[in-house]
């Protein structure tokens, strides 16, 4: 049964409020309409596009929290952060991030998302990657969304913070990395 425009827009607004990181494509499938219809509905309702919604949430929630680097230097969009505990970021694989011939994401972008998230999760003004162990488990293609999840695991025998980052595309592991983070409190004998 086809919904009226008013009913669809009301449901659309509610859906975006509940899940602000939902894409227009996902909304179009859910509401059985074209992507253009979703975009027109969003415009009429003054709901910004996904990237702007993400930036709004990230800026409002994390700008004062991230210490080790400016939020705009984190690769991907931070959507969850608890310093010295965990962090999550998302990155859409756009044409500028892939090889032109095969549309596969360049590995350094996947690494950069994970590494910058490992830096961002550290509760210190200075955090640097001292060492990392990485594994790419499958290629990532243009149009896919990478969700990176960082978890602080503890300290190594040199007092460096160990951050484990796992990156997923639709719940499939595509990258994993163990980052050994040096930070300025290491020098001061703190933490």
UniProtKB/Swiss-Prot annotation:
Gene3D superfamilies per record: Hotdog Thioesterase, Winged helix-like DNA-binding domain superfamily/Winged helix DNA-binding domain
Annotated SUPFAM superfamilies: Thioesterase/thiol ester dehydrase-isomerase
GO MF annotation list: DNA binding; DNA-binding transcription factor activity
Keywords assigned by UniProt, alphabetized: DNA-binding, Fatty acid biosynthesis, Fatty acid metabolism, Lipid biosynthesis, Lipid metabolism, Repressor, Transcription, Transcription regulation
CDD domains linked: hot_dog
Signal peptide range: none
BP GO terms, sorted: fatty acid biosynthetic process; negative regulation of DNA-templated transcription; negative regulation of fatty acid biosynthetic process
Function field: Transcriptional factor involved in regulation of membrane lipid biosynthesis by repressing genes involved in fatty acid and phospholipid metabolism.
Similarity field: Belongs to the FapR family.
Protein name: Transcription factor FapR
Gene name as annotated: fapR
